[in-house]
Amino acid sequence: MLSVETHAAAPWPDALDWAARAAEAVAAAFAITPFAALADAAPLVEVAVRLTDDAEVHTLNRDFRGRDKPTNVLSFPQVQNDLLESLANSDDGEILLGDIVLARETCAREADEKGVSLAAHATHLIVHGALHLVGYDHMDDVSAAAMEALEVKALASLGIANPYADQD
């Protein structure tokens, strides 16, 4: 069973149910991967989503990635890629798959630049982060294209337009 725990540490707009949005985004991301069974697996599979500010993400990005600046989203997988396939068959009671952390100011700025709502952009970033938790990456053009295609498919299932449509 999939559990998404969301914690808002910074002033994210209250008009949206961020916990429900995060849960939908993570579930949509997993549903279009070979790891869809994790959502209904016997062990509790938990993903933590933290909505925070640029200052906290800057610190995390510096400390864990060696990049001394904020970024829009960070993912911290807790399960090695080679163990992911066996999780659905695990008899462990609970598995922490990992953490996704979003920076409000960066997300809001990027949403404005793209002409989309903060909710749509944050949902995209949560989908992106969830895909990282199950082993997807964008270190080269081929893996980036594959990951973007999955993001587009997951977002479409949530009624969100292709965020890459205007890119050449």
Swiss-Prot record:
It is found in: Cytoplasm. This is Endoribonuclease YbeY. The keyword Calcium does not apply. Pfam families: YbeY. Zn(2+) binds at residues 128, 132, 138. Belongs to the endoribonuclease YbeY family. GO terms for molecular function: metalloendopeptidase activity; RNA endonuclease activity; zinc ion binding. It is an enzyme of class 3 (hydrolase). It comes from the Bacteria. HAMAP family: Endoribonucl_YbeY. The keyword Repeat does not apply. Keywords: Cytoplasm, Endonuclease, Hydrolase, Metal-binding, Nuclease, Ribosome biogenesis, rRNA processing, Zinc. Binds 1 zinc ion. GO terms for cellular component: cytoplasm. Its EC number is 3.1.-.-. Single strand-specific metallo-endoribonuclease involved in late-stage 70S ribosome quality control and in maturation of the 3' terminus of the 16S rRNA. One of its GO terms (biological process) is rRNA processing. PANTHER family: ENDORIBONUCLEASE YBEY, CHLOROPLASTIC (PTHR46986:SF1). Its cofactor is Zn(2+).
